[in-house]
């Protein structure tokens, strides 16, 4: 089983002076992960993560130049690479798939050309820089489509449809990948990983439309995606499609206490107020020991179900001055203005708020 991490914000952490420790001893976290058997780095790519005036959207400034820099660092340490195309200028997920600024106003034909050309150019640049990815993710958490509204799968009346346009867009990215990097494995990544009906519908449509891909990818966060048993029942059912299966994003908290910065407490996505995640069944306490038990049990179950890979999402995204999930400009682009501009995911890391390695770090091993 492949064990990986998505550490897309790592260069941003280093630029802001982040330090990581085993006890009181400074460590290089990428070396430490690799020693535990982690050997694949997932790196997200946004088209143009800046406002028209040039203000960065932050959260790592993850454009293609960033991919090349982080990819070179990871490859030098023995990591394979996974390039995660969002096909957006900033965060793309089930609740938002914003068309890049440069592509707005295009119809489906023009968007297909844009996706193909952009994908081909990025992968050609990666190959020229000697950081060609071993895996390419064509879209991020695309359960509800990509490039909204043109490629949206959730319709205004609440039903699902529009697969013809969606599949044309997706196929353009897959075709570019096959042409530039024929040996790279193509991943289609969804969330809602406890919903067998959605996965059956989606991947049946991929068969119907002749989609060229290799791996079914799923996100799993127990706050939103049910129990591990529901996840693995769904992944087992997906074996009927004949593809490899990976968990592309995984996370669990080591605390529900907010961190303090500038003398004030900072908001977290998952904190002591569980009303935000009403369906969450807390089998594991959000403590260092509970997080370690979750990670250990999850990997044991993944192996027993024949999962081909697991990636922990942003295990190094510790809090610090200048570290945030979105600038005001980034929030404006995705329509989420007025929110905090801090790091709201810091309690899901495998290092604590001071950068000390947590017990779950050593549980995350082959």
Feature locations, PLM:
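Glycoside hydrolase catalytic-domain groove-lining segments
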Residues: 27-34, 164, 175, 179-185, ...
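Acidic-and-aromatic substrate-binding clefts and catalytic sites of carbohydrate-active enzymes
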Residues: 13-24, 48-65, 143-146, 191-200, ...
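Short aromatic-enriched loop/helix-cap "lid" or pocket-rim segments at secondary-structure transitions
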Residues: 16-18, 93-96, 148-151, 199-201, ...
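Aromatic-rich peripheral "rim/lid" segments of glycoside hydrolase catalytic domains that contact
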Residues: 154-156, 233, 237, 255-272, ...
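Hydrophobic faces of well-ordered beta-strands that scaffold small-molecule active sites
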Residues: 3-7, 39-43, 81-85, 134-138, ...
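Boundary/entry segment of secreted carbohydrate-active catalytic domains
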Residues: 1-32
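Soluble or luminal CAZymes and related metallo-dependent hydrolases
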Residues: 24-25, 62-66, 110-118, 162-169, ...
């Amino acid at each position: 089983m492949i064990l990986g991490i998505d550490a897309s914000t790592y260069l941003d952490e280093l630029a802001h002076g982040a330090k990581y420790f085993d006890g009181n001893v400074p460590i290089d976290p990428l070396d430490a992960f690799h020693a535990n058997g982690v050997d694949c780095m997932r790196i997200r790519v946004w088209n143009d993560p800046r406002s028209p005036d040039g203000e960065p959207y932050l959260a790592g400034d993850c454009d293609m130049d960033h991919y090349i820099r982080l990819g070179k660092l990871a490859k030098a340490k023995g990591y394979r690479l996974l390039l995660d195309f969002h096909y957006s200028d900033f965060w793309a997920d089930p609740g938002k798939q914003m068309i890049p600024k440069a592509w707005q106003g295009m119809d489906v034909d023009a968007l297909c050309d844009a996706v193909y050309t952009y994908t081909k150019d990025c992968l050609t640049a990666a190959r020229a820089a000697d950081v060609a990815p071993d895996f390419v993710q064509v879209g991020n958490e695309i359960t509800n489509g990509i490039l909204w509204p043109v490629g949206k799968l959730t319709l205004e009346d609440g039903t699902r449809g529009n697969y013809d346009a969606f599949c044309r867009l997706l196929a353009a990215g897959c075709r570019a990948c096959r042409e530039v990097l024929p040996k790279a494995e193509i991943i289609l990544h969804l969330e809602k990983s406890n919903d067998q009906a959605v996965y059956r519908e989606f991947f049946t449509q991929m068969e119907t439309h002749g989609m060229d891909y290799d791996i079914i990818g799923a996100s799993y966060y127990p706050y939103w995606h049910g129990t591990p048993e529901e996840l693995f029942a769904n992944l087992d059912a997906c074996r009927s499609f004949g593809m490899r299966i990976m968990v592309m994003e995984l996370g669990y908290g080591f605390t529900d206490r907010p961190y303090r910065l500038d003398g004030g407490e900072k908001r977290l996505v998952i904190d002591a107020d569980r009303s935000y995640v009403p369906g969450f069944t807390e089998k594991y306490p959000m403590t260092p020991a509970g997080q370690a038990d979750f990670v250990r049990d999850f990997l044991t179950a993944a192996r027993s179900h024949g999962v081909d890979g697991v990636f922990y999402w942003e295990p190094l995204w510790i809090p610090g001055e200048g570290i945030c999930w979105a600038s005001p400009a980034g929030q404006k682009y995705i329509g989420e203005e007025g929110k905090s501009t801090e790091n709201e995911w810091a309690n899901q890391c495998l290092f604590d708020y001071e950068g000390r390695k947590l017990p779950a770090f050593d549980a995350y091993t082959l």
